[in-house]
A protein has these predicted regions:
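Conserved helicase C-terminal RecA-like lobe
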Residues: 1-167
Length: 167
């Protein structure tokens, strides 16, 4: 949400339960648009099968790289649907960033995407769920400081990680 053009965070989110893309699907996107930055490649791939009336997809219509792909297979359609759902969610949450406290935004993301349930179902799920809850608590405490906003919160968490602070 902070900056979709960062390749590693974007790839991590796309392969997480949020995007639910497989390694093969990620490779399909990259090979379809090898000369575009990854964010633009994802957008261009999604636009191949996107609905022009879709608000989330319409935000990325500027990218028109050539993939040389003629296929409209079921696999492509499934990937397009995943990307459409992902970009719709991103557009929804990004629209809320300027006026929603970080802890409320995190809580909504966790609840509406099913991320909390997904984390709880993983090995050591109870500990993982506790870590997610702690992140929301840290966001709430952060909102009480003089700093505000998602960008500053991401930097704050980065500093905690950098100095190996147990949060």
């Amino acid at each position: 949400l902070d900056n979709a053009r960062q390749d590693l965070p974007l790839a991590a989110v796309l392969t997480s339960p949020f995007g639910n893309l497989t390694p093969a699907e990620m490779a399909e996107i990259r090979t379809a648009y090898p000369n575009l930055p990854f964010y633009e490649a994802v957008r261009a791939y999604a636009e191949e099968g996107g609905d022009s009336g879709n608000e989330g997809m319409a935000a990325g219509r500027a990218f028109t790289g050539e993939s040389g792909r003629e296929s409209d297979s079921g696999r492509d359609r499934a990937l397009w649907r995943k990307l459409e759902r992902f970009f719709d969610q991103m557009a929804h949450f990004r629209a809320k960033v300027p006026y929603t406290p970080v802890h409320e935004l995190l809580a909504e993301i966790i609840e509406t995407t099913g991320f909390g349930l997904s984390v709880a179902a993983m090995p050591a799920g109870a500990q993982r769920a506790a870590n997610v809850d702690m992140l929301v608590e840290k966001a709430s405490a952060f909102e009480g400081t003089s700093y505000k906003g998602l960008f500053n919160f991401v930097r704050y968490i980065g500093q905690l990680r950098k100095y190996d602070v147990d949060y």
